């Protein structure tokens, strides 16, 4: 897997009259099997860049390429990108959206297209692996 950012910029509020440049002319290559971390002050563009890398935002200018494909193309498969690029939100409470821990952990496998039974099996294994008592699952 490779990701290339080519002169990527992102501006918030461009159509509303409130303009805030979050990223400007970012060039980055993330090669196969590489991991990156982003650090910086509040408002420096970390969350914006992460959302672009995950396909949640599209660059205002410039291009992002995943496996050589331009992510702005109409037929680009964002699901495949999101299966390969992980995202942890800045505020953990924003990433929980189910009514139980078990259902929340099932979301990832379900989003990958696995059967309900396989999702539940994987969630059970993952929660058990990290030491959750099965009484807390439901």
For the regions a language model picked out, list residue spans one by one:
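A short, flexible loop at the N-terminus of ABC-type nucleotide-binding domains that lies
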Residues: 1-2, 11-25, 74-77, 116
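The feature captures the beta-strand-to-loop junction immediately N-terminal to the Walker
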Residues: 39-41
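Helix-to-loop junction immediately C-terminal to a conserved catalytic motif
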Residues: 54
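Conserved ABC transporter NBD signature motif
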Residues: 62-73, 81
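Short helical segment in ABC ATPase nucleotide-binding domains corresponding to the A-loop/adjacent helical element
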Residues: 93, 102-110, 120, 124
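Conserved ABC ATPase "signature" region
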Residues: 117-136
């Amino acid at each position: 897997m490779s990701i290339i950012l080519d002169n990527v910029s992102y501006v918030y509020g461009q159509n509303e009259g409130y303009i805030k440049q979050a990223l400007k002319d970012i060039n980055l290559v993330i090669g196969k099997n590489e991991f990156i971390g982003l650090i910086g002050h509040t408002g420096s563009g970390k969350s914006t860049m992460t959302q672009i890398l995950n396909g949640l935002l599209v660059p205002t200018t410039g291009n992002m390429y995943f496996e050589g494909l331009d992510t702005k193309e109409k037929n680009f498969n964002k699901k495949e990108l999101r299966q390969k690029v992980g995202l942890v939100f800045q505020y953990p409470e924003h990433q929980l959206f189910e009514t139980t821990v078990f259902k929340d952990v099932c979301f990832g496998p379900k989003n990958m297209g696995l059967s309900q039974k396989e999702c539940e099996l994987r969630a059970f294994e993952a929660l058990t692996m990290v030491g959750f008592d099965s009484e807390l699952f439901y």
